[in-house]
């Protein structure tokens, strides 16, 4: 069942999402050569807790970090640890915060120092594909209208969208209905209604869309070893234009 949030619930969600977005921004500022991914995770954890919230990911299904930090060919669910960032890496940071009963969820991929033109294009196309998708995140449209727009834009730029993992509803639970794929034909899936809150998150690979999960049962990498990027925001469906909730202004 798809949860429709009322205004009181949305007030809590907006705050959760502001905290989440600020934690993402903090992580992005830390991405530079010589920084350990565990350092970034600790900063994310400490910031979220300082705001009276809890890291949504910590302990979720046994996940050991407060954020997912995925470098280069790691698509999602990278476990923060001893890896020291190097010049030329691309670093995806996925963050969630739980505040007064509701979750925020967002992600972005950041360059570490100077990166290749191809890597920068991948980051840019991934981010823009999100904005292409939310043009269709409007009352009366269907979920797959978002999906189709993302896929069309990504593939027109020579990249592929991951199919094994998808976006999702978010609210009182970190993962709620409906699923929001980044691929598919338009005009399918549930109709969008005001009060729906969706984590729309293109995961885009430079090569094949296929992925594999490592022995730690979390780290998900591209099957061909090529780069991957990720961009995500929590989005509210309204009577008019969609509202991106994971923005940090005014915190």
What annotation goes with each model-predicted range?
Residues 1-251:
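Active-site neighborhoods and metal-handling regions in enzymes and metal-associated proteins
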